[in-house]
Amino acid sequence: MQDITSESIAEFITSHDIPLMATQTKLCIPIIFRMCQKMLHGIKFDEIKVCDNLIIDGHHRYLSAFIINHKLGQVPTNSTSATEPISWDLVKFVEDDWDTPAKIDYLNELDAKYNKLEIEFVKQITSR
């Protein structure tokens, strides 16, 4: 897998037709990286929540799965009056990690337990 950077994501977005629309203005590159790594190693994720063609919950999961050509489930949900569609080329991809080291450890532990994997393996595949 190529490195996940704002440039590689922008290039990916311009060269692919992404069926679902974003409703979030910013996404976190380190989270996308970790999710791509986990998906590539068979770790399962919850479905994303979609209303019509809008992502309501699961932007990082959706884009990560799309980048690595991984099938991710979708469940219907409702939107609110505040939900606004955003073109993917207007979404800002930030380098700052939104997850604390403690949260990363917690999520890795959950994923290891749920997928019956050793925690050290999950830590290894998600470290840069």
Residue spans for each PLM region:
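N-terminal non-globular leader segments, chiefly Sec-dependent signal peptides
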Residues: 1-13, 110, 122-128
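Short alpha-helix boundary/capping and kink motifs at helix termini
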Residues: 2-56, 60-66, 73, 78
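Basic- and aromatic-enriched surface patches that contact anionic nucleotides/nucleic acids
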Residues: 47-128
